[in-house]
Amino acid sequence: MRKELEHFTIDGSLGGQQEWFPEYWMKIGGCGAVTACDICIYLARYLKMPEACPFDAWNISKEDYLSFGEKMRPYLSPRPTGIDRTEIYVEGFGRYLADSGVSGIGFREISGTEDVETAVREVRAQIDRGLPVAYLMLMHRDKALDDYMWHWFLLNGYDETEERFLVKVVSYGEGKWMDLRHLWRTCRRRKGGFVLLETEKQIEPNGLQTGYVPHGE
């Protein structure tokens, strides 16, 4: 079974990109702010929370997105060590939502020290609810994942069979299917984790696509 959440595009880019920002620190360390902006656009579109996004969430331009990123920056400011703990992300993102007049959204943190099957269950349940997942990965033994180390990205879908549980990783303007169990088993001492949104609001039906699609099609 494959389930994917809708995600906006800007000039062919799936979601925003930190590389768009002219300022050095946002360009190299703006991943936390970018994931928060993407989530806010989703909230405005599918949870009827227009206060979450200061622009028209259905017609957002690259210029709008850059302005939005600068608005988010004081709350999730890039720093030399990065936003390297989920509690930093929750505190900053929570302040942004409160200052913007958004209510009815809470957060729950899942530590990277949890076992892998807990991670699978939590991601599956969150996507089934129609909500994206903010994921922090620090170090990983697999050097092929270098671009995703010390990095925040979104999960907005899963593709599950008896053999594997793939997640759709949204970052750098594209979506890639990756094995969640492999991502989670970093074999490194410091762990990241992910942040789940909690709300009792009804997600709009077009926020979620469901159905079985063989992986790769």
For the regions a language model picked out, list residue spans one by one.
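Active-site-adjacent substructure of cysteine-protease-like catalytic cores
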Residues: 112-169
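C-terminal domain-closing interface element
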Residues: 78-103
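Active-site-adjacent structural segments surrounding the nucleophilic cysteine of cysteine proteases
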Residues: 1-87, 216-217
